[in-house]
């Protein structure tokens, strides 16, 4: 509490207000909780994975948590700072549909080449299925990661080149909102 570094400076609050959908009081509340859980101001992959394990106790969220961690860690320093955490949280919980889709696209585009390949999507969908474990019963046509990926590509890959551009991803998500709901695991009730 008496440490200067543990308190947000007014200019940091102003910057976060400008780059997120949170109010000043919300930013300060989130910061208080973040500093409580991460006294050094850095959220590690291990800590991030533990958070996911609390929400998905019946599956193995480690692979998916790693993918999400990599998107939260904007500067790729191996840690999530409070600013990185709050900006990602802002998009995923309060962002527009298009902002959420851009964020999701970055999550699925594992090699950051501007396309989502079948293999990348299979990696993500497999991680999601492992994370939810047996807690979700899926219809026969989507009960394996491979079937799910095939269905998504059938709907989204308009030019049939086995990779999705952001435009294809965006249009496909608008045509079939259930695809993005199943993929993002974002709380759409907070949009």
From Swiss-Prot:
Record GO cellular component, one term: growth cone
Compartments in which it is found: Perikaryon; Cell projection; Cell projection, Growth cone
Primary location recorded for the protein, binned into one broad class: other
Domain EF-hand: 24-59, 60-95, 96-131, 144-179
An annotated GO BP: nervous system development
Function field: Neuronal calcium sensor, regulator of G protein-coupled receptor phosphorylation in a calcium dependent manner. Regulates neurite extension and branching by activity-dependent Ca(2+) influx in growth cones.
Residues that hold Ca(2+) 3 according to the record: 157, 159, 161, 163, 168
SUPFAM superfamilies: EF-hand (SSF47473)
Misc: Binds 3 calcium ions via the second, third and fourth EF-hand.
Domain of life: Eukaryota
Keywords: Calcium, Cell projection, Lipoprotein, Metal-binding, Myristate, Neurogenesis, Repeat
Binding-site residues, Ca(2+) 2: 109, 111, 113, 115, 120
Binding-site residues for Ca(2+) 1, renumbered to this chain: 73, 75, 77, 84
Family classification: Belongs to the recoverin family.
GO molecular function: calcium ion binding; calcium sensitive guanylate cyclase activator activity
Protein name: Neuronal calcium sensor 1
Taxonomic source organism: Lymnaea stagnalis (Great pond snail)
Sites of N-myristoyl glycine lipidation: 2
Pfam families: EF-hand_1, EF-hand_7
Family annotation (InterPro entries): EF-hand-dom_pair, EF_Hand_1_Ca_BS, EF_hand_dom, Recoverin
